[in-house]
Every structure is written in structure tokens, then in C-alpha cells.
Amino acid sequence: MYPGIHNFSEIGKLNKVLLHRPGKELEALTPATLERLLFDDVPYLKIAQEEHDNFARVLRENGVEVVYYVDEVAKAIADPARQIQLVNDFLNISKIHAKGLRASMTSYLLNMPPKQMVAELIAGIKRSEVATKEATSLMDLVEDDYPFVSDPMPNLYFTRDPGACVGN
């Protein structure tokens, strides 16, 4: 097998697959958050995990190498410089610009091992987890009823939705 991605058929033999095991991000789904998080129903985490585990087992039994999104991203950010870059990119994409909150989130995330950091980013970061100690700007003082500073990513367990590859 050659390194990299070489996908020339969507109906040929599957050799390797990237999956995400449903986690805490599904617990963020409530009737109030369904529309915002692009879901139609609130899945039951334990059942979703059991179904996922059975699916992954069947894939392995059929010779498919199963790799997990969290593990692969954690490997990619093993270098502390890459962790800093990921956190900065994540905060920018999430439009988190309030200085106090940004500093709190940066400290919160960079004090985790890479795998835990990735899992937390996917689960969504609650305001209560990164309360700013001191307001450094007007933005830090703005109240919001939404419990998350960054949205959870429940759609990630449909791993083909955020990305697909054709060719190499």
C-alpha cells in the first residue's frame, strides 16, 4: 500500500476507513439546540455508541483497517507548536476574539494532552469550563444564555459529510 490517499472507486473494496465514535457532543443535542446543530432528533448516546462499535467490529471482521478521527488528529498535533496553531485557528474560525475569553480558552486547551484536546473541541466547550477570571474588554462582559463558547460537532460521526476524497 502506498502512503497517502488513493481512492478511485466508491464501490470497490474498502481497505481503510476513518470513523468517529459518538461522544459527549451528542449530549449537547437538546430540543433547543437541534436546529442550530443541524440535527432532526436527539439520539441516545449509549445506543449510538453500541451501534457504532458493532459497525466498526463488522468492518474489522471484513479486513478493513479502522482509524479514528480523534487519534489521527492527536497524532497530527503531537508537536506543541501544532497544538498552538490548532487552538489559534480554532478560536479564529469560532470567532472568539474577546481577549479574556480567548486567553482562558487557550490556557484550558493547551493544558490537555492532544487526544483530550481534540475530544474537547469536538464535544464543544461550555462557558462554565472556561470562565474568564477578569474581563479585559467589553466583549468579555457580554452575557449569553447559550451554554457553549464553541459549538459541539455532533455531525462528525457522519465522517463522510465534512470531507471526501477522490483520486489522490
Located regions from the model:
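The feature marks the mature, well-folded catalytic cores of soluble enzymes
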Residues: M1-N168
